[in-house]
Amino acid sequence: MRSNSILALSVLFFAATKAWDNTPPIPERVEGLGEGSGNLRIDFEVHYDLMCSASAALYPDFATFLDTPFLNGKVRDAVTVRYVFQPLTYHHATWIPHKLLPFIVDQCVANSTSCQYINYMNFCFNNQDDILGSTDKSFNQIVQNWTAKVAKQFGWNQKDLTDLFDYDTDTHNSEMRTRYMWKYSTSRGVTSTPSTFVNGIMVQNFPGSPDEWMQLLKDTYAGQQNGASFASHQFLQ
């Protein structure tokens, strides 16, 4: 009888600990992909919504900034960039273009030389009207139209893309991974797009020109130099 009581208490304890285990799902890899060599170990994490007009309008300035001469090369040689996406529900049907991203990430992981992650971002920015202007169409119609357009642009099989929208045929865990995108961005305190972080710190005012991006980089780099000078001074004391 005593052993039965101990067994029952053990089962109850195990059940209680499982009930209180609130560890969230852990994504299989760091959210987002990007570019840059990172020679100076300065990291830019940029959050966009593929259907956000401000994201589309301001991205070209950031692209120009990356190709701007800096030190002995270009900005992209000095920094690393990671593009992260936050599908904001007030942008009509924004979930649809974002749900293709897990498929694209997997393509990039399998073959980094043919990665279309950044090209797809550009494609979405340039074709926002196809999604945002489809208020007279059903969800399935938008999926069919968008996947046909994307498949033609990138040479992918349209069925591979439409399969992402059916739980029984999706092999990329697309729904959950799209939720991870939103959850990650939200957990970082992002409430609107575009937003950016430099070395993990959120920038309060998103830069509005290549010059503003460059000033942000120079300020960060100057901090590195001041830190190095301080460390050298301390070492020599």
Predicted regions and their residues:
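Short, flexible, glycine/charge-rich loop motifs used to bind or transfer phosphoryl groups or to couple energy/partner
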Residues: 32-35, 71-72, 185-187
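A short beta-strand-turn-helix
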Residues: 20-44
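Cleavable N-terminal signal peptides of Sec/SRP-targeted secreted and luminal proteins
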Residues: 3-18
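Proline-rich low-complexity regions
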Residues: 24-27, 53, 87-88, 194
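Structural alpha/beta surface segment adjacent to cysteine/selenocysteine redox centers
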Residues: 40, 45-148, 188
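C-terminal cap of thioredoxin/glutaredoxin-like
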Residues: 20, 42-49, 59-67, 143-237
